[in-house]
UniProtKB/Swiss-Prot annotation:
Protein name as annotated: Actin-related protein 2/3 complex subunit 5
Pfam annotation, one family: P16-Arc
Gene3D superfamilies for this protein: Actin-related protein 2/3 complex subunit 5
Positions of the UniProt region annotated as Disordered: 21-44
PTM notes: Polyubiquitinated by RNF128 with 'Lys-63'-linked chains, leading to proteasomal degradation.
Function: Component of the Arp2/3 complex, a multiprotein complex that mediates actin polymerization upon stimulation by nucleation-promoting factor (NPF). The Arp2/3 complex mediates the formation of branched actin networks in the cytoplasm, providing the force for cell motility. In addition to its role in the cytoplasmic cytoskeleton, the Arp2/3 complex also promotes actin polymerization in the nucleus, thereby regulating gene transcription and repair of damaged DNA.
N-terminal signal peptide: none
Subunit description: Component of the Arp2/3 complex composed of ACTR2/ARP2, ACTR3/ARP3, ARPC1B/p41-ARC, ARPC2/p34-ARC, ARPC3/p21-ARC, ARPC4/p20-ARC and ARPC5/p16-ARC.
Lineage: Eukaryota, Metazoa, Chordata, Craniata, Vertebrata
GO biological process: Arp2/3 complex-mediated actin nucleation; cell migration; regulation of actin filament polymerization
GO cellular component terms attached to this protein's record: Arp2/3 protein complex; cytoplasm; lamellipodium; nucleus; site of double-strand break
């Protein structure tokens, strides 16, 4: 009887928390190398009047995996600058040019802009939110609000 108990004691060496799907693991995927969007490329697209390309360039390299708040703030200000420079008539066409992940990323930046409103940014961000919601649906909002990695 005791021999059977000793051999079955191996189960105590198993770390059951390792198999918990709700356990948070802070993964570092080499995010320190992410510098965010290229500000020079975005500015050149804005100067040329190519707003859709400026939006694509601003969303191209998001600093999602980095822990540096300065990099995230810089990327947020670049995207906000692009969003503010759009005309109201062109917003829907620009949102339609994005794929599902692009719309989700845009929503992340919109909510980041809502966190720290400036003089006219809230009205512009609400227009962008309306068009992004029409393109991505409610699921886009849910994915942004439940995401662990932020921009």
């Amino acid at each position: 009887m005791s021999k059977n108990t000793v051999s079955s004691a191996r189960f105590r060496k198993v770390d059951v928390d390792e198999y918990d799907e709700n356990k948070f693991v802070d993964e570092e995927d080499g995010g320190d190398g992410q510098a965010g969007p290229d500000e020079g490329e975005v500015d050149s697209c804005l100067r040329q009047g190519n707003m859709t390309a400026a939006l694509q360039a601003a969303l191209k390299n998001p600093p999602i995996n980095t822990k540096s708040q300065a990099v995230k703030d810089r990327a947020g200000s670049i995207v906000l600058k692009v969003l503010i420079s759009f005309k109201a008539n062109d917003i829907e066409k620009a949102v339609q040019s994005l794929d599902k992940n692009g719309v989700d990323l845009l929503m992340k930046y919109i909510y980041k802009g809502f966190e720290s409103p400036s003089d006219n940014s809230s009205a512009v961000l609400l227009q962008w939110h309306e068009k992004a919601l029409a393109a991505g649906g409610v699921g886009s909002i849910v994915r942004v609000l439940t995401a662990r990695k932020t921009v």
